[in-house]
């Protein structure tokens, strides 16, 4: 099963071809074919242990793969929001200081992106004192500071309450529309993300099924992995699908702690 569905008007940002990865003598990714275009939202779903986070890190170039190809647009700039980022309680750090760790940070741009993500009020606050929603928005602001062509998010609503989840997904959608960046998202929140997703990739070490939410909702592999209740939830959403290579290193900054 491959996922290379792009509309003719979409510039390809990143492509995986027959991608395989092994960890500890075990194959964790098998024959992945995947492309994402400019302005497109692609959501990767799958059970625990399906290889979702591994796939993201392989695509970003921070973990190795065993076979296949990863092809990125020349000079592709990526903003990355990790699944988790440990905060050292012994060494307090403010939001401003963390954002200043990025290369060539412009103070005006920093304030603007914090305003855009709704957390300008925490500029001088310690990271340890932020709520779950505030912390995720700060990580999103850090990613957007790079003016990315591709925004990659690994379970971005962890530690966020229900109302915060809704608001955060709405913010991600607004950033995509405003900046025109592609979005590659890993999520378990089927009832949240499917409404605004262009394509769904159902992963369980290999791509089980892929396509629009409407297409995936009718696929037997989706029902087998997630059950009839999830299928019915996904089918509730009406979807409107909208919508060419260089081997180059990706321009993405990921802290060593985030790769653990």
Swiss-Prot record:
One Pfam family hit: ABC_tran
Domain of life assignment: Bacteria
GO BP terms, alphabetized: response to zinc ion
Domain ABC transporter residues, every copy: 14-229
Catalytic activity: Zn(2+)(out) + ATP(in) + H2O(in) = Zn(2+)(in) + ADP(in) + phosphate(in) + H(+)(in)
Topology term for the membrane: Peripheral membrane protein
Cellular component terms per the entry's GO annotation: plasma membrane
Binding-site residues for ATP, renumbered to this chain: 46-53
SUPFAM superfamilies xrefs: P-loop containing nucleoside triphosphate hydrolases
Keywords linked to the UniProt accession: ATP-binding, Cell inner membrane, Cell membrane, Ion transport, Membrane, Nucleotide-binding, Translocase, Transport, Zinc, Zinc transport
Major location (coarse): membrane
Record keyword Cytoplasm present: no
UniProt-listed PANTHER family: METAL TRANSPORT SYSTEM ATP-BINDING PROTEIN TM_0124-RELATED, ZINC IMPORT ATP-BINDING PROTEIN ZNUC
Subunit structure comment from the entry: The complex is composed of two ATP-binding proteins (ZnuC), two transmembrane proteins (ZnuB) and a solute-binding protein (ZnuA).
Family: Belongs to the ABC transporter superfamily. Zinc importer (TC 3.A.1.15.5) family.
Summary of the function given for this chain in its UniProt record: Part of the ABC transporter complex ZnuABC involved in zinc import. Responsible for energy coupling to the transport system.
Name of the protein in question: Zinc import ATP-binding protein ZnuC
Gene source species: Magnetococcus marinus (strain ATCC BAA-1437 / JCM 17883 / MC-1)
Gene that encodes it: znuC
